[in-house]
Regions:
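N-terminal hydrophobic targeting/anchoring segments and the immediately downstream early-domain regions
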Residues: 27-191, 244-255
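Histidine/acidic residue-rich metal-binding segments in metalloenzymes
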Residues: 153-163, 185-233, 246-256
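Amide-donor transfer/coupling interface in amidating biosynthetic enzymes
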Residues: 1-31
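Short, ordered loop/turn segments at secondary-structure junctions
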Residues: 10, 85, 174, 216, ...
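Short, catalytically relevant binding-site loops at active-site mouths
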Residues: 218-219, 239-241
Length: 256
C-alpha cells in the first residue's frame, strides 16, 4: 500500500498526516511481530476442529472453522494440537466401546486431512518435529485426546493411541469418569484420581504421553501432581484470578 499525504499536509490537512502516521506505526508493529514469529516456534495446544472433519472438509482450504492451514499461515502459527473429543456418557462397557470407536474415527479423519495436504503439513510427535517442519515450510499437527473416557478401562488402549500418534490425553471432560473427578461435576466420585486413574497416570508416564489437566477437579490436579513422575500440562485453562471458570486454575495451582 502506498499513501502520500505530503500534499494534503502541506495544504493544512493535519488529519490525513496523523492517519498516515497511524498506518506507519501499525506497519512497524506488524513487521516486528513477523520477525518474532520468524525466530520462535508457536503452538496452539487445543482445538476441537476435528469435529468438523466430514467428507467435504479440507483443512488446506479456507474453512469457517477457527483453524485451517490458510489461517495458520496468516497468523504465523507453526503447530496445532487437534483434539479428539468424546462426550462423557455412561461408564458401562457398551458406551465405553463407542467412545473408543469415536476416538479411532477422529484420528483417521486427522490423518486423512494431513494426507490430502501433505505438501503443506505433517503429523508431529516430538518438539523436534515442530522445528523441523517449520524449516521445511510445513505446519505441524499434533494429536490429543480430550476425555479419558475414550480409553475406557483398558490400559492397552493408551499404548494403541500412543502408537497412532497421540501425545497428550485430557483425563476428563465436564463429568466425572472412571479415571478422575471433573471440575464441572457437582458431586465428587473419587475425590481426585480413582485407583484406575493412578494406573493411567503411571502408564502415560511410561509411554511419554503428556497428562492434560484442563477440566480436572482441583482434587484431581493435586493427586496427579502427587503421582506423576513427569510434568503436566493444562491445554486450555487460564487463571481464576482473571476470570472465574471451573476450568481455570487458582494461583496456588499455577505456582505448583
Amino acid at each position: 500500500m502506498q499513501f502520500h499525504p505530503e500534499a494534503l499536509a502541506t495544504a493544512g490537512d493535519s488529519i490525513s498526516a496523523r492517519f498516515f502516521y497511524f498506518l506507519v506505526q501499525k506497519a512497524a508493529t506488524y513487521r516486528h511481530a513477523k520477525e518474532i514469529h520468524r525466530r520462535i516456534l508457536s503452538l496452539d495446544t487445543h482445538t476441537d476442529t476435528p469435529l468438523d472433519f466430514d467428507v467435504s472438509y479440507n483443512i488446506g482450504t479456507r474453512e469457517k472453522t477457527q483453524v485451517c492451514l490458510p489461517k495458520m499461515r496468516e497468523g504465523k502459527l507453526d503447530g496445532q494440537y487437534l483434539a479428539c473429543w468424546v462426550r462423557q456418557g455412561p461408564c458401562d462397557e457398551e458406551n465405553s466401546l463407542k467412545a473408543i470407536d469415536r476416538v479411532d474415527e477422529l484420528i483417521r479423519h486427522i490423518y486423512r486431512q494431513v494426507e490430502m495436504n501433505g505438501e503443506q503439513c505433517a503429523i508431529a510427535r516430538t518438539p523436534d518435529d515442530l522445528s523441523r517442519l517449520k524449516t521445511e515450510g510445513k505446519k505441524a499437527f499434533y494429536i490429543g485426546i480430550e476425555n479419558g473416557y475414550g480409553i475406557s478401562k483398558d490400559l492397552k488402549n493408551i499404548t494403541r493411541f500412543h502408537d497412532a500418534g497421540v501425545t497428550y490425553i485430557t483425563l476428563c471432560h465436564t463429568r466425572n469418569n472412571d479415571i478422575c473427578d471433573s471440575s464441572s461435576d457437582t458431586t465428587a466420585r473419587w475425590n481426585g484420581l480413582s485407583p484406575y486413574g493412578r494406573k493411567v497416570v503411571k502408564e502415560m508416564n511410561r509411554l511419554g504421553i503428556m497428562i492434560d489437566l484442563s477440566h480436572a477437579a482441583e482434587s484431581t490436579f493435586w493427586d496427579v501432581l502427587k503421582y506423576s513422575k513427569a510434568p503436566v500440562i493444562v491445554s486450555h485453562s487460564s487463571a481464576s484470578a482473571i476470570y472465574r471458570h471451573d476450568r481455570n486454575l487458582t494461583d496456588e495451582q499455577l505456582r505448583a
